[in-house]
Swiss-Prot record:
Protein name per UniProt: tRNA uridine 5-carboxymethylaminomethyl modification enzyme MnmG
Subunit and partners: Homodimer. Heterotetramer of two MnmE and two MnmG subunits.
PROSITE patterns xrefs: GIDA_1, GIDA_2
UniProt entry tagged with the keyword Cytoplasm: yes
GO cellular component, one term: cytosol
Keyword field: Cytoplasm, FAD, Flavoprotein, NAD, tRNA processing
Native species: Listeria welshimeri serovar 6b (strain ATCC 35897 / DSM 20650 / CCUG 15529 / CIP 8149 / NCTC 11857 / SLCC 5334 / V8)
InterPro entries: FAD/NAD-bd_sf (IPR036188), GIDA_C_N (IPR049312), MnmG (IPR004416), MnmG-rel (IPR002218), MnmG-rel_CS (IPR020595), MnmG_C (IPR026904), MnmG_C_subdom (IPR047001), MnmG_C_subdom_sf (IPR044920)
Principal place of residence: cytoplasm
Species classification: Bacteria, Bacillati, Bacillota, Bacilli, Bacillales
Keyword hit for Iron: no
PANTHER family membership: GLUCOSE INHIBITED DIVISION PROTEIN A, PROTEIN MTO1 HOMOLOG, MITOCHONDRIAL
Cofactor list: FAD
Region (Disordered): 203-227
Length: 629
């Protein structure tokens, strides 16, 4: 193939899925001349699986992306067909927003957003090779021979990386949704010395809405007063579409059991490791054989399509078996299957080959983000893409990378887990993975991250001024409640009695009364009137910060303790072989991961407290080993 010089850029982003679009937008908006290359321009920000955004932990990630200046939250607010706040009956640490998106509107709106950015060039092209000079990535080469040069490159190829679709006995090379896969780039990464592993994910069949008997299902409406993902969104759409709940049954399970020998999950044809937290229906009936039924949610894929996503029925059984089992489910007895469910296997770069900036250790100037790093989910991909784009642009401008701490963001937890622990299966973000989840809430993402977003140039001055005003209003109202004393008047006592709260014996500070579990900020506002208007967002923040003050303080003390460990940096030139006393496994892991701090070293699987003590003594005594020649 004859090659030709096709142009020079600051940053090149390979792929335009959920990681790629955030990487490209971040880089371009920070002032870097950015090229985005994608196999198919019609697939920008496409949702090949569930047409939804958010959920536990993931919804908080979308808020964090928005607080830093990313696009996923704004785009979802423009294109949702249903919005629900989950876990409203639980504490604020686990509340999360989830949207059903119009998958077609979502991708078209995102593509239009990218096309409007003056620093971004969006082109169709299949990247086969990287341009590497002296261990530094200098650009990419496409299958048409075009050579694009750049100072940094971000790979976000997702499940296209040597993708293979599997349906029963049928197996063929393909990206998601029967798109062209990226084969040669995977081969090239292996040639460069990267360790790749085969992972697997799956998707359920899509069925025709007009052939569903919804009277046999349970309606799942959106919230009456939907909330936004983006801190910029003002007006919310009230015209929402419902989802519908139904269940599998013993007949469904019998059909699946009878055909397990034809499922790639249980035959030698499956090579990739699947996602633990997104099991196929075959996997569910085997692992949970005692359950007589499993939930199935029928989710519309958009306003202008008949296609309905059958959530909970991810499968790679043969096509005729899928049709048969669908028709055993209440409401789907006469359903028409429009698209068959399938499994897809793909290559993932083992993420312990990355620095916390998402730059690869093997090749300078090369970043990876999204499912290629071993994660599952649009939100996890978008969060990584944003950080990779930010750090790729900052490297161009000779600035230090932005690395979010585990106490700052779920995105920080995600990336730290990946680069420190690696992953043996597709990684899904869960609230249980965050040790400081009371600090990493849906409601306070802007308070945690807007400062950083503004500092790096992704949050406008106008939005930053609004943020500062909100911050001031929260503090002013908290201070007012700390100073305002409520007297035990007849009116107050009657209100307390009505809601089952103990009567007052003496006067009480408004803040102390608010700490009672049954007392809301609205109740306090009825007793203690205020002169200035307080938005619902500010009221919510005041209530949470006052009510959970003790728990938040405890978490902050834990963070301070952890930060002292983060501040103990491990010198770049350390020779672990020169440290006597380290366990063999710890020595191997420390040499492979190359942690930046004692705190990161302590989180590596196989490195125990005794190893950390030895490492600390070695560093503190100044015994920094010789630099390898």
């Amino acid at each position: 193939m004859q090659t030709y010089d096709a142009g020079t850029f600051d940053v090149i982003v390979v792929g335009a899925g959920h990681a790629g679009v955030e990487a490209g937008l971040a880089s371009g908006r920070m002032g870097a001349k950015t090229l985005m290359l994608t196999i198919n321009l019609d697939m920008v920000a496409f949702m090949p699986c569930n047409p939804s955004v958010g959920g536990p932990a993931k919804g908080v990630v979308v808020r964090e992306i928005d607080a830093l200046g990313g696009e996923m939250g704004r785009n979802t607010d423009k294109t949702y067909i249903q919005m629900r706040m989950l876990n409203t009956g639980k504490g604020p640490a686990v509340r999360a927003l989830r949207a059903q998106a119009d998958k077609w509107d979502y991708q078209h709106e995102m593509k239009h957003t990218i096309e409007k950015e003056e620093n971004i060039t969006l082109r169709q092209g299949l990247v086969d090779h990287l341009v590497i000079e002296d261990g530094v990535c200098k650009g990419v080469i496409t299958n048409s021979g075009a050579i694009y040069y750049a100072k940094t490159v971000v790979i976000t190829t997702g499940t296209f990386s040597r993708g293979e679709i599997i349906v029963g006995e049928l197996r063929y090379s393909s990206g998601p949704n029967n798109q062209q896969p990226s084969v040669k780039l995977s081969e090239h990464l292996e040639e460069l010395g990267f360790e790749l592993r085969r992972f697997k994910t799956g998707t359920p069949p899509r069925v025709k809405s007009s052939t569903i008997d919804y009277s046999k299902t349970e309606e799942q409406p959106g919230d009456d007063h939907p909330r936004a993902f983006s801190f910029d969104t003002v007006d919310m759409m009230l015209d929402q579409l419902p989802c519908w709940l139904t269940y599998t049954n013993e007949t469904t399970h019998e059909i699946i059991q009878a055909n397990l020998h034809r499922s790639p999950m249980f035959t030698a044809t499956k090579k990739g490791t699947g996602a633990r937290y997104c099991p196929s229906i075959e996997d569910k009936i085997v692992r949970f054989s005692d359950k007589p039924r499993h939930q199935i949610f029928l989710e519309p894929e958009g306003k202008n399509t008949e296609e309905v996503y059958v959530q909970g029925l991810s499968t790679s059984l043969p096509e005729e078996v899928q049709r048969e089992m669908l028709r055993t489910i209440p409401g789907l007895e006469n359903v028409e299957m429009m698209r068959v469910g399938y499994a897809i296997e793909y290559d993932a770069v083992m993420p312990d080959q990355l620095w916390p900036s998402l730059e690869t250790k093997l090749v300078e100037g090369l970043f990876t983000a999204g499912q290629i790093n071993g994660t599952s989910g649009y939100e996890e991909a978008a969060g990584q893409g944003l950080m990779a784009g930010i750090n790729a642009a900052r490297k161009v401008f000779d600035k230090e990378p932005i690395i979010l701490g585990r106490d700052q963001a779920y995105i920080g937890v995600l990336i730290d887990d990946l680069v420190t622990k690696g992953t043996e299966e597709p990684y899904r973000l869960l609230t249980s993975r965050a040790e400081y989840r009371l600090l990493l809430r849906h409601d306070n993402a802007d308070l945690r991250l807007t400062e950083i977003g503004h500092e790096i140039g992704l949050i406008s001055d106008e939005r930053y001024e609004r943020f500062l005003a909100k911050q001031s209003a929260i503090e002013a109202e908290k201070e007012r409640l700390q100073k305002t004393r409520i007297k035990p008047t007849a009116e107050v006592q009657a209100m307390l009695k009505e809601i089952g709260s103990g009567e007052l014996k003496d006067g009480i500070l408004a803040a102390d009364l608010l700490r009672r579990p049954e007392i809301t900020y609205d109740k306090i506002a009825q007793i203690v009137s205020r002169e200035t208007f307080i938005t619902d967002e500010i009221a919510e923040q005041v209530e949470i910060q006052v009510k959970y003050e003790g728990y938040i303080q405890k978490s902050n003390l834990q963070v301070e303790k952890m930060k002292r460990m983060e501040d103990k940096k491990i010198p770049e030139n350390i020779d672990y072989d020169a440290i006597s006393g380290l366990a063999t496994e710890a020595l191997e892991k420390l040499k492979k991961i190359e942690p930046l701090s004692i705190a990161q070293a302590s989180r590596i699987s196989g490195v125990n407290p005794a190893d950390i003590s030895i490492l600390l003594v070695y560093i503190e005594q100044g015994k920094i080993a010789k630099i390898s020649k």
